[in-house]
Amino acid sequence: MAIIPQLSLFAWEEIEELGDLERLRLVIEYMPDEQLMRVLEKERGKGRDDYPIRAMWNALLAGIVFQHDSDAKLLRELARNGQLRSLCGFNGKVPTPWAFSRFLHKVLMHQAEVEEMFDDLVRELKKIVPDFGKRLAIDSKAIKSYAAKKNKNEKEDGRRDLDADYGKKVYRGTREDGTRWEKIVKWCGYKLHLIVDASYELPIMFSVTKASVPDINEAHHLLEKMEERQPEILKKAEILTGD
């Protein structure tokens, strides 16, 4: 793991002052992804290596850091930005949309390795920040599907979103004048369930479900998952809050 002494943990002002490329460099250096890279490289074997596994993975990370909401936007950024291509590890050649889509499909087949990377990062935070995980909060967030409505055609062809369904969240509060308000949000897609450190606002455990899955049901599942994967944090937690 690379050490960058000039940056202190949670010094967000320092991170925000960095450019996108520098932030991406930090992500690439600190990401505990070696096991996943070896698995993907072994699967590729001695086949064509037009777009190296590690370069493709770094490009995927770049899409997250640069907040691109589609593969097409990321690939256009790679095409115009030589520094980004170099940092990712491409030797001047930008992946085709088909090649990148195929790589994403490969990564999705290795959810266990991806979740282990996440757990490793959480454990590293626990080592560095002694009170990390003492104050926990649980919540969920709507993730809209690209499809406007649930697809009635259940035949899988690699293009349709067959797993998305409908969800609803109700928000309530009180105005300054004492009157009550209510806001109902409906969407088609998924739901991201999170257990986070309430002090540092960093995730500790997560799951993604269909939008219709009730928060309370998945909360029990997340706590069981946390007991299995992060037992020390759960044992030392003092507070768990939720809506």
Predicted feature locations:
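Short, Lys/Arg-enriched N-terminal segment that forms or immediately precedes the first helix
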Residues: 34-48
